[in-house]
Structure formats: structure tokens, C-alpha cells
């Protein structure tokens, strides 16, 4: 079981929680400023009406509660928020935790290097993997469209196939 932390309660965080959490090989957790508004039983619905049902294990606003337990930390925040967010999780990241960004085109790698240094294993998508919106905040999301393909950049990841396989499965 791979432990994933979805960081952020916006559109990408909502959709990712449902889609990734619906896969039985992934245990999903959410780090958000509004944990009291999230439910442990969550779903994302795509354009054809397919439901991705997920159980969110830990929902918190405290990075210390979840970041040390995760194999992959997926940052679903707008680019301007990356530096301050990375400052809040810095002390809890393990050297073996993979840090990912869904908004890579907004300077994700630069923010990682500025805050965490040059040795952090990280990856970032060039563009967001899909479009959508929360239906009921913290409970459900509507997936409105998929990207036909994804481009990903990686830094300090010796087993890149692991990340490629993760992205193929979840997106």
C-alpha cells in the first residue's frame, strides 16, 4: 500500500482525492486548511457519470500528523502558494518521500530548490492532469475533462519508473 498525501483543498485536490483514493493500492490522506469540512467517504464523478469512491484516511491541517507517514506528497496548490507551503512541511519530509506538484509550469522545481535544497526527490506535471470542480466542498467533485497526455519532469528520482507507473495508474 502506497501512502499518498493530497495537499490542498481546491479543484485538483478534490479530484485527486477521489480518483487516487478509489484505487485499492493507494491510501489517501488530505492536508488542508479546512479539515473540519472534509468527509472520510469521498467521491469524484466523471463526465460519463462514473463514480470514483474513496476513503480518505487522515484529514488534517497539521503537516506533522501526515507528512512523515507518506510515500508520495502531491502538492495541489497554485504556484504562488508553493514556497510558503513547502516551508510548512519542510521539517516533516523524509529523504525517501517523493514530492510531486500538479502545477509544474508555475516554478514548482524552483520553489522546491529554494526551500528544500537541491537533493529532494521530486516530480511535477507540466499541466494539471484534468479539469473539474468540487461539487460539495470536502465531500465530492465533478471531473470535467482529462488531458490527452501528461508531461512530467523529475529531479533526484533514481527509480523514475515508479513515478511513471504511479502517474499512469492514477491519471
Predicted segment positions?
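A short helix-to-beta-strand connector/capping loop
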Residues: 50-58, 118-121
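NAD(P)+-binding Rossmann beta1-loop-alpha1 motif at the extreme N-terminus of oxidoreductases
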Residues: 1-51, 67
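Internal alpha-helical scaffold of NAD(P)-dependent oxidoreductase catalytic cores
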Residues: 140-171
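Rossmann-like NAD(P)(H) cofactor-binding subdomain of soluble oxidoreductases
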Residues: 74-75, 79-137
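Residues at the C-termini of beta-strands that transition into short coil/loop
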Residues: 32-34, 63, 103, 126, ...
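Short acidic low-complexity segments
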Residues: 55-69
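Short, charged/polar "capping" segments at the starts of alpha-helices
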Residues: 36-41, 107-111, 162
Amino acid at each position: 500500500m502506497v501512502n499518498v498525501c493530497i495537499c490542498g483543498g481546491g479543484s485538483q485536490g478534490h479530484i485527486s482525492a477521489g480518483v487516487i483514493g478509489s484505487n485499492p493500492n493507494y491510501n489517501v490522506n488530505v492536508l488542508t486548511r479546512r479539515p473540519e469540512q472534509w468527509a472520510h467517504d469521498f467521491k469524484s464523478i466523471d463526465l460519463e457519470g462514473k463514480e470514483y469512491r474513496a476513503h480518505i484516511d487522515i484529514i488534517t491541517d497539521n503537516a506533522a500528523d501526515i507528512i512523515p507517514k507518506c510515500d508520495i506528497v502531491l502538492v495541489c496548490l497554485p504556484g504562488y502558494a508553493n514556497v510558503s507551503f513547502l516551508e510548512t512541511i519542510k521539517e516533516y519530509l523524509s529523504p525517501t518521500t517523493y514530492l510531486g506538484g500538479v502545477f509544474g509550469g508555475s516554478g514548482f522545481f524552483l520553489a522546491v530548490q529554494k526551500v528544500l535544497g537541491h537533493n529532494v526527490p521530486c516530480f511535477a506535471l507540466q499541466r494539471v492532469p484534468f479539469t473539474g470542480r468540487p461539487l460539495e466542498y470536502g465531500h465530492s467533485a465533478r471531473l470535467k475533462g482529462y488531458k490527452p497526455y501528461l508531461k512530467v519532469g523529475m529531479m533526484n528520482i533514481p527509480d523514475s519508473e515508479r513515478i511513471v507507473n504511479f502517474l499512469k495508474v492514477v491519471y
